[in-house]
């Protein structure tokens, strides 16, 4: 069980889960391994106890534990039944529940048979999109969890943001650590871009060797357990080649933010000599590559994003993009490097938009591209991302697609260096770091 003194609040997610407390739907927390799902369940149990719920009303089961290794859906049901307290409402917390075969039968029975409130976590999307949808007929709420945002990274690493006067008469933001050492906010952001946002990094400190060990463990668990072992348990054996899986993973990591044709990936890997193996014959088919990519998407290692034709008002089927769930994992796979930082910060912005509740797509207008169209209910936001707006050529490149859009929704350009102007004909130029730490 997690030691509670190590827990730090993730209010974005805790508030979401509290909002659905004591409602009928099963609360399902999804996300990549080690992004904080178990800690979120523990935080929820602490919240319950603070509001008067007693220990005997709470049942916690983490199916990563050897104690539950051979549990079936029948023994799962009987175990829970034995812990029911008569005439009291029960609160069930099931961590990585998908490791129990036919778990959904048992969970659905708990919902029907007992006076209970159910919370579960899972590290693959297959459990939610397939079995769960069938057995619970929509009676579930998904809380999608991600690694730390930049704002959370500051909190987890005990940085405090303070505003100080700048030489030009304005203000600038600096980060102070718990030893009262101060850093430019950009320095801390560079650390975030290097180490990523996995919560475990905060436990070991910003140490590159230790970070690589932690990230290697996450990668190995996702690839070996969540993908290869899961495929074997399903009996389908669609994803069986760990070398091909790693090469596709590295290819996608190296090409975040690029338009990708699935049919070309196999040829690219072969042409670059990345699949040299005397036992492997031919080029992986587009179907095989897509199957492997789907497995990576189901494990929340990558997220895909589709293109939207702004004038035609329809989604396009080809040349979507992929973003990696944590930039630290990308650095683990490819090595720490400074090049391609533009796509890396684009990656950060994409996930920040998801955290803020937006549905995100790529915008196409004529032969130009808008980095992101972010939609939420009746709201829409067009976003361009670039490292600097100081060059006239860059300003033209980033502003022209937005200027072509004929509607009144907000349009912004996010950059690390905004230049002197804060607005261009109604298009806002916003400092990326200010935006990331804003509400």
Feature annotation, model-predicted:
Residues 37:
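Conserved lysine of the Walker
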Residues 59-88:
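Short glycine-rich substrate-engagement loop in P-loop NTPases that contacts/grips substrate
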Residues 4-22:
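Pre-Walker A adenine-sensing motif
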Residues 131-254, 258:
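Interdomain motor-coupling "hinge/lid" segment immediately C-terminal to the ATP-binding subdomain
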Residues 29:
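Hydrophobic anchor at the beta1->P-loop junction of P-loop NTPases
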Residues 40, 44:
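Hydrophobic positions on the alpha1 helix immediately C-terminal to the Walker A/P-loop
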Residues 203, 208-379:
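Accessory nucleic acid-recognition modules appended to NTPase machines
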Residues 117-123, 144:
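Structural recognition of the conserved hydrophobic beta-strand(s) that form the central parallel beta-sheet
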């Amino acid at each position: 069980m997690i030691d509670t003194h190590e827990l730090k609040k993730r209010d974005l997610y805790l508030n979401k889960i509290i909002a659905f407390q004591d409602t009928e739907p099963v609360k399902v927390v999804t996300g990549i391994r080690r992004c904080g799902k178990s800690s979120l369940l523990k935080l929820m149990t602490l919240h319950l106890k603070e509001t008067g719920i007693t220990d005997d009303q709470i049942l916690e089961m983490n199916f990563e534990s050897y104690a539950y290794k051979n549990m079936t859906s029948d023994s799962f049901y009987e175990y829970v039944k034995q812990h029911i307290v008569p005439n009291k409402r029960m609160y069930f917390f099931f961590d990585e529940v998908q490791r129990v075969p036919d778990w959904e039968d048992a969970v659905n029975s708990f919902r029907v048979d007992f006076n209970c409130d159910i919370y579960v976590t899972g590290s693959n999307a297959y459990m939610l999109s397939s079995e769960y949808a069938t057995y619970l007929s929509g009676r579930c709420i998904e809380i999608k969890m991600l690694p730390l945002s930049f704002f959370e990274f500051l909190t987890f690493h005990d940085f405090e943001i303070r505003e100080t006067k700048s030489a030009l008469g304005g203000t600038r933001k600096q980060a102070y650590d718990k030893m009262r050492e101060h850093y430019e906010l950009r320095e801390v952001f560079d650390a975030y871009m290097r180490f990523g946002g996995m919560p475990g990094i905060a436990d070991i400190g910003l140490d590159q060797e230790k970070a690589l060990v932690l990230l290697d463990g996450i990668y190995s668990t996702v690839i070996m357990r969540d993908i290869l072992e899961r495929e074997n348990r399903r009996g389908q054996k669609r994803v069986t080649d760990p070398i091909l899986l790693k090469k596709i993973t590295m290819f996608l990591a190296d090409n975040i933010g690029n338009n990708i044709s699935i049919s070309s990936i196999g040829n690219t890997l072969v042409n670059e000599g990345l699949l040299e193996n005397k036992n492997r014959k031919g080029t992986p088919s587009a179907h095989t590559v897509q199957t492997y990519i789907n497995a990576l998407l189901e494990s929340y290692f990558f997220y895909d994003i589709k293109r939207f034709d702004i004038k035609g008002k329809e989604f396009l089927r080809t040349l979507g993009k992929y973003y990696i769930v944590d930039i630290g994992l990308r650095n683990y796979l490819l090595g720490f490097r400074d090049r391609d930082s533009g796509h890396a910060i684009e990656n950060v912005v994409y996930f920040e938009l998801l955290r803020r509740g937006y549905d995100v797509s790529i915008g196409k207008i004529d032969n130009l591209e808008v980095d992101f169209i972010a939609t939420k209910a009746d709201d829409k936001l067009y976003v361009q991302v670039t490292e600097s707006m100081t060059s006239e050529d860059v300003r033209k490149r980033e502003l022209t697609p937005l200027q072509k859009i004929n509607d009144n929704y907000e349009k912004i350009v996010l950059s690390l260096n905004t230049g002197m102007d804060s607005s261009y004909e109604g298009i806002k130029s916003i400092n990326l770091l200010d935006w990331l730490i804003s509400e």
